[in-house]
Amino acid sequence: MELIEKVPFHFLKFEEGQTIFKAGEQTEFMRFVVSGQAQAETALCGGNVTLIQTITAPDVIAPDFLFGRITTYPFSLTAKTECGIMQLSKAYVVSIMQSDKICLLNMLNYLSRNAQKGDVSYKRMLSSDTSQRLAVMVFMLTGHRSQDIRIRYKQKDLCKLLGLRRSAMLELISELETRGVVLDNGTELQIPDRQQLVAELVKPGK
């Protein structure tokens, strides 16, 4: 890691494979991927299921955990390639939002979009269509610009996480594979196109 400049916003460089932060660390800064790619890993079901996503520049990192009741990172982040990170202190973020209405509006729009995910997801989880559960999980736990989304799993743990019997889960995965929405090798699900999964399985009126 290399600290390039000491100013209200800091630029840091990470080499491929370096840890940027770990799940559970305090969100002391608003961070952005400004060059390269970073890989986020979210541990689920006691760590037996791992959701992996690639964050590609330019993108913001978990700003909805900067303030509020939970101010720790929900995932671990490592540099997937040589990666540039810009970080701003919380105090500086507040000062920007107080002085710049466009920045304030952008932040409110981002937070509102993420808050509305919960409403959509809860309604879908209550529906009788169990095929939506995988889409809901991906929808909730990944960013709308995330790429190379993968889920590493053991069958019993993924069944538990989705609340499905083994036969129902295998049928779901087989159906999604047939439609080209996921690729599966028995221990890892690959989701080539997040938008396709969300558009097909999480939409009003389905």
List where the protein language model places each region.
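Polybasic "coupling" helices that flank or enter modular domains
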Residues: 80, 98-163
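Cyclic nucleotide-binding regulatory module and flanking cytosolic helices
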Residues: 1-16, 60-61, 65-69
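A short beta-strand-loop-beta hairpin characteristic of the jelly-roll/cupin
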Residues: 38-50
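Phosphate-/nucleic-acid-contacting segments
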Residues: 141-206
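A cytosolic small-molecule/anion-sensing beta-strand core signal
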Residues: 15-16, 34-35, 56, 81
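Cyclic-nucleotide recognition modules
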Residues: 51-109
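Glycine- and acidic-residue-biased ligand/ion/polar-headgroup-sensing regions
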Residues: 28-41, 57-58
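Short phosphate-coordinating micro-motif centered on Lys-Gly-acidic
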Residues: 19-26
